[in-house]
Regions:
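Helix-loop junctions at the membrane-solvent interface of multi-pass transporters
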Residues: 37, 66, 94, 164-165
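Extracytosolic (periplasmic/ER-lumenal) interhelical loops and adjacent juxtamembrane/interface segments
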Residues: 96-140
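A hydrophobic membrane-anchoring alpha-helix module
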Residues: 124-173
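C-terminal TM-helix exit segments that contain a strictly Trp-centered aromatic cap at the helix terminus
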Residues: 30-35, 83-98, 114-115
Length: 173
């Protein structure tokens, strides 16, 4: 009886990890489709969001196969999703600025990584520039960072719901 309950609990948590991983795979696939098929160049903030989503998916996938330390992996997915959400919020802020307050466009990221100090390139990634303020695509009036924020919030809710064992256990029944 107890073993069956524990098994149901683990299966439910593994399903949530797999769901989070699936969300992340879809988001990364859409990002690459937009870049290579639609011709949209990712700005520095978009790259940070991609990295956060990829790390979220990687943590969920490792947690799915590891079969232990579920709280640790759900905590990791929460932290990486919060990082992606924070980057998306900053990106949305830049997009909402009036044109006269938008920061100047900086050099290309490849140029920065080749010719500037790594700390300067990293700062540019996190702060963003004028390229990040341009809305190049939207669906239902929501721009790309808006959709990233929505999916990061969903991932955060899924992860946090599994951090409380009583809540997670009641979902598995």
């Amino acid at each position: 009886m107890v073993y069956t309950s524990i098994l149901k609990f683990r299966v439910a948590m593994k399903k949530v990890l797999l769901l989070i991983f699936g969300f992340c795979v879809v988001l990364i696939a859409v990002a690459y489709f937009m870049e290579y098929q639609m011709g949209l160049e990712p700005c520095p903030m978009c790259i940070i969001q991609r990295i956060a989503i990829a790390l979220t998916g990687l943590a969920a996938l490792i947690g799915y196969f590891h079969d232990r330390w579920f709280k640790f992996y759900f905590s990791l997915t929460t932290v990486f999703s919060i990082a992606g959400a924070a980057s998306a919020i900053r990106h949305l802020y830049l997009q909402s600025l009036p044109e006269d307050q938008v920061p100047f466009c900086g050099p290309d990221l490849g140029y920065l990584l080749d010719n500037a100090y790594f700390s300067d390139a990293l700062r540019m990634l996190f702060i963003g520039d004028g390229n990040c303020a341009e809305v190049v695509w939207s669906l239902f009036g929501v721009s790309i960072p808006g959709w990233v924020l929505i999916w990061c919030i969903i991932n955060i809710c899924l992860s946090v719901s599994q951090l409380n064992p009583k809540t997670a256990f009641s979902q598995s029944n």
